[in-house]
Design a protein with these regions (language model features):
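Short, surface-exposed linear segments at secondary-structure transitions and domain or protein termini
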Residues: 44-48, 95-98, 231-240
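Hydrophobic/aromatic-rich core segments of domains that either
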Residues: 140, 172-260
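Short intrinsically disordered coil segments
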Residues: 24-26, 87-96, 227-231, 253-255
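Intrinsically disordered, low-complexity N-terminal segments that are enriched in acidic
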Residues: 1-90
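Secondary-structure boundary elements
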Residues: 13, 77-81, 87, 97-168, ...
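A broadly conserved detector of short glycine/acidic/proline-rich loop/turn motifs that flank catalytic sites
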Residues: 15, 25, 45, 75, ...
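Generic structural "secondary-structure junction" signal
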Residues: 21, 41-43, 63-64, 79, ...
Length: 284
């Protein structure tokens, strides 16, 4: 299936303000790209790029002194047209056998307070089977316990606060599940990106960026989604990190309120028409 992903973000500017951006599809999808994303900036501004400590592709710019800054992008990827299939490699590695790069994802972080949730985690999940069944039990619990409510979203809510309040949005589901996994000695990292509604019945909510997490099982990272808690078709990663603080779509070092926000993640046309768009993208 060809999947088109993209966005348009408009920020109101009142002074030149440095910004850091994580708005590209992740390199993990390199073999699926039909039309690569390209970050368009209006008005045109100098733009530089770098990779952060987690391997995410990031951009830097300074906003105009006044008016509006528009950031947009679109990409087309060839993704599996069927719902995700859970991996059969689901064993849980003892801490002493984990790769060095996994160890940081066992520790508490800004939004994932493992110290406050450790006793709770062991009380609830200490008797569950190791590996995928334990992670799935955590996802099942988070999915039942947290009520999704955009109206009660706040950017400072932590995993422990989500546990106490029982309400949140997709990032809160992911933070709580990540913290509980880490408390059970399962490395877990936070992910952000796109998830399509392909295969779901209408009505559809307005498209938004999404959050899920990956757990280290079977000797590799595997995706879990406590918000939806069901296989989905068309999941596209943008960034990974310890929690949402590491993968913010934009970090502005000054006042830049968001004036417009649209996200697209939907099936696209057949490959022959993509060639025309690819040429146009390179020429533009």
């Amino acid at each position: 299936m060809n999947l088109r992903v993209g966005f348009e973000l408009v920020f109101a500017c009142s002074q030149p303000t440095p910004m850091l951006l994580m708005l590209h599809t992740h390199a993990a999808h390199a073999n699926e790209v039909l039309v690569p994303d390209r970050l368009l900036v209006g008005p045109p501004l100098p733009l530089t790029h770098y990779h952060d400590a987690f391997g995410n592709y990031c951009s830097r710019l300074i906003t105009p002194p006044c008016g509006f800054l528009t950031l947009s992008s679109t990409a087309v990827l060839a993704v599996a047209g069927d719902p995700e299939v859970p991996s059969l490699d689901s064993y849980q590695s003892p801490v002493e056998d984990l790769p060095d790069e996994c160890l940081q994802f066992l520790l508490g972080s800004r939004y994932c307070e493992t110290d406050l949730l450790s006793n709770v985690a062991w009380q609830m999940f200490g008797n569950t089977p190791l590996g995928r069944p334990r992670v799935q039990a955590i996802c099942d619990y988070v999915h039942r316990h947290v009520v999704f409510d955009y109206q009660q979203a706040r950017p400072t809510r932590t995993a422990f606060e989500t546990f106490r309040e029982g309400v949140g949005v997709c990032r809160d589901y992911a933070h709580l599940a990540v913290a509980l996994c880490r408390a059970m000695n399962i490395p877990a990292r936070y992910c952000s990106g796109y998830i399509s509604d392909v295969g779901l019945p209408p009505p559809y909510a307005p498209m938004d960026f999404c959050a899920w997490f990956e757990a280290w099982l079977g000797g590799r990272w595997q995706a879990f989604d406590p918000r939806n808690n069901a296989p989905r078709t068309g999941r596209v990663l943008m960034a990974r990190g310890r929690d949402a603080a590491d993968v913010a779509l934009s970090n502005a070092f000054g006042p830049t309120p968001l004036a417009k926000f649209t996200v697209v993640c939907e099936p696209d046309e057949e490959p022959e028409s993509l060639a025309v768009r690819a040429v146009a993208s390179m020429q533009g």
